[in-house]
Amino acid sequence: MKTIVSGIQSTNSLTLGNYLGALKNFINLQNDNKMFIFIADMHSITVDFNPKELESNRKSVASIYAACGLDFDKNIIFYQSSVLAHTQLSYIITCHSYMGELSRMTQFKDKSQKTNANGTTNIPTGLFIYPCLMAADILLYDADLVPVGKDQKQHMELARDIAIRMNKKYKTNLFKIPEIYQSEMGAKIMDLVDPSIKMSKSNANTKGTIFLLDKVEDVRKKIMQAKTDSLNKVKYDVENQPGVSNLMTIYSCLTNKKTDEIEKEFENKNYGEFKTKVADAVCLLLEDIQKKYQIYFNSNEIEQKLEKNAKKCNEIVNKKINLVQQTLGLGTYKG
């Protein structure tokens, strides 16, 4: 049995990319592994946010987790902010990281450029040290595997580097070195309008993003209007047919069909027929998720389970934070 750790930010609404890149992985892994899955609300305050929206989004994300099939009794699912050891270890890790390596993080460069697009906005320090909190999220639990999308791979590699660095400095196996878990398909779903960029809740043009709580008729419209090409041939070729390849990835993830099977299925068929099948598969999934979501969001069941899991989690991580503090000469944590 492996220990697996991962989480998703509680900003805006989760997307089909979040589901296929992360949530579906969690569901597949939860039966045979020990899983710590958190709603990353502390990561959500690294950029400008509205407190009332954040509070609502936290519960929304938790309800979507449950609606998608994550078991709150089998897994330890919790709010990141409910376990203070995350931020405590994050500070310690920040003290063992370097300005240069944090400056090289691609996500920091991209997000800081967007934040300061007009040249007058200050860049939050939290955005710069985001990878340190992510490293703490992982190393705190001695994770064996961490399911991440391709865009988080660099942060994951940094977490490994810092763990190795601290183990070497203190001449002890303070942290387990985690491995990346990345599924072959679905780790990165692209935008429907611009398949050169990742499908994201923060993209300016929402026509390219499918949100899990979108109306199904809107979802179908987005898929039918998705960018393809003039070849009118369903073929997996990311370089020459990025739009079609992206739709094939989505269809593959939802039907468990390989790309060559999909190519054969739609041989001599036009893009309209192909898009209709993709839309059918996506809408079937979303109808089921949304029905269950309403039940969970409008009850107190999830909040009660999150509170119970946070207590369980704190008991586990306090042992780890004590070990870290003692190793650094900081004494025993009394929290």
Curated annotation (Swiss-Prot):
Keyword Aminoacyl-tRNA synthetase: yes
Subcellular compartments: Cytoplasm
Family the entry assigns: Belongs to the class-I aminoacyl-tRNA synthetase family.
A GO CC annotation given for this chain: cytosol
Organism: Malacoplasma penetrans (strain HF-2)
Protein's name according to its UniProt entry: Tryptophan--tRNA ligase
Binding-site residues for L-tryptophan, renumbered to this chain: 137
Coiled coil feature spans: none
Family matches, as Pfam families: tRNA-synt_1b
Annotated residues for binding of ATP: 9-11, 17-18, 149-151, 189, 198-202
Annotated EC: 6.1.1.2
UniProt cross-references to Gene3D superfamilies, sorted A to Z: HUPs, Tyrosyl-Transfer RNA Synthetase
